[in-house]
Amino acid sequence: MTSMKPIFSPTRLLVFAFTWMLAAPFAQAQLDRVYDLQGDNVSGAVVERSKDGVKLEKAGAIKDFKAGEISKIMFEGDPASLTKARGFALDGQYDQALTELKKVKLNTIKRDVIKEEVAFYYAMCEAELALSGQGKIDDAARRLIEFAGANRDSWHFYEAGKLLGDLALASNNSEQALKYYKSLENAPAEATKIEARYLQGLVQLKLKQGPAAVADFDKILGLKSQTTQIVRLQTLSKAGKAVALAIQGNGEQANALTDTLIAELNPEDVEIAARIYNARGASCEALDDIEGAIMAYLHTHLMFSVQPDAHAEALKRLVELWPRVGKPERAAQARQELQSRYPGF
């Protein structure tokens, strides 16, 4: 895999951080539609936007929408291909989204905010594809940094920061991943701030720092807020804590935690399911239950492979574990898939 150093160097990071801080409001008046995370929408004119969100004017009243609490904005004048691309991207169909984005003729677009949307979804889709092994991480990171530099007033600002952290972590650049994830603590939405802590916990897991990871996850588990977003982050944090406990050799405690998680598992939430079964695999390994660990990682591999980082981790563990039960040929198969889908993992 291409080295991340040219993209995630200290100099580039400082430039990017400076861009982060300089994001400023921008005013326009058009008929637009802002959708929240529940799918409800309000129509009006986006009269101001910044990295922290947008202000929508309707019948003389101004309503604030925070970045992190917006699912999408449909702008007056959106090309049909952008509308389709946005829908595909938010549904995880990144190839189809890029196909539609390539049909957009930028020279026919009058509003800068719409050009900004095109640029963001290009960068987002390329990043997500790179994370799934279908593109170069270095190129995807470069496009995201270019997006942030050219669109300092975008409500997608923190989304871009999270993706940059994901790309850095996928490249084993944990230090830069921590910096990007920590920057999300400056976001206006409570859930984004909490997600920042969860993501930092994932980095600690990558570094095999069990106590530090437990500390991050426990901060989330101790929260009283019960919004849908935060409850979901608490479930993810339980799975992360189970892995951290396993790293510390507390297999029984980790196993008990994953028992509860599996009993309450919703298989439609692929990310949660994949992380729970990987946590189960880690807890079984800590108990020297190799067959149990293999079964858990196979759940992720066979049922939840669309979650790329969890799938890659499951394959990596299967490469190590299959020979221990006398099946080196299965290890070779897992290694081949790991190298072809996630080169450099």
Q: What are the residue ranges of the model-derived segments?
A:
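Bacterial N-terminal signal peptides that target proteins for export
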Residues: T2-V15
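Bacterial N-terminal signal peptides
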Residues: L14-A24
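Compositionally biased alpha-helical segments
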Residues: Q28-S171, E175, K179, N186, ...
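Register position in tetratricopeptide repeats
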Residues: L90, E128, A170, K206, ...
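Conserved positions within tetratricopeptide repeat
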Residues: L98, Q134, D138-A141, Y158, ...
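Alpha-helical scaffold segments of alpha-solenoid architecture
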Residues: R232-N250, A256, S283
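TPR/TPR-like (Sel1-like) alpha-helical repeat modules
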Residues: I294-L302, L315-F345
